[in-house]
C-alpha cells in the first residue's frame, strides 16, 4: 500500500472520530464577539495538533479571539505548506442551542459547520493522515485566526499571518468550496491603505501645471 492509500485508509478508519470533533467544536459558541468560546475552540484544536506532534503557540489578544499557530516538521528542508483558517463564526450567541449540530439525510447542519469549523477539522485529520502514512517531505504550519468575521478589528492577526507565511511554498484555506468538489484557486480580497499626498491643491481644469 502506497502512502496515498495509507492516508485515505486512515481517514476512512477515523471518520466517526472526525465527526465527533466537528460536533464538539460546532457546539462551542464562537460568534464574532464570543472571545471565551473562540479561545475554547483554539484550545481544543491545539490539543488535537499537539497530539499529532505539532509544536503549539498562541498569540493572545485582550479584545479578540486568540490566534493558534502549530508547526510540524520544522526541521524538514523543503519549503513548507500552510493550512489557514479562522475559528470564529458570523453567527450570534445562542445559535448552538437553538440550532445544534445535526446530521440529516447525509448533510450536516449547525452554526459554523462550513464556515469554517468543518474545513479546519478536515485539514487537522489530513495532517494526522499524513503522519500515519509516514509523510516527512515538507514542514507543515497551521495558522488559525480568532476574529476573521470582524476583519481583525481588535487584533494584529493580519500582521501575524504575513510574518508566519514567509518562505512557504503554498497555503490551503479551509473556506467552503463548491458543491462539485472542485478546488478553488482564487478569491476576491480586500486591502485597506492610508495614503499621504503632498502638493498644491488644484482642480484639473484650473492651474493643472502646478
Regions found by a protein language model. Give the residues of each.
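Acidic/His- and Gly-rich active-site-bordering loop/insert found
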Residues: 2-111, 131-135
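Beta-strand secondary-structure signal
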Residues: 69, 141, 192-196
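Fold-independent oxyanion-binding glycine-rich loops
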Residues: 72, 85-87, 105, 145-147, ...
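Short glycine-aspartate micro-motif
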Residues: 80-82, 108, 169-173, 192-194
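Glycine/serine-rich anion-binding loops at beta->alpha junctions
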Residues: 107-121, 203
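Acidic/histidine-rich catalytic neighborhood of metal-dependent amide-processing enzymes
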Residues: 116-188
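Acidic-enriched catalytic cores of C-N bond-cleaving enzymes acting on peptides and small amides
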Residues: 185, 205-210
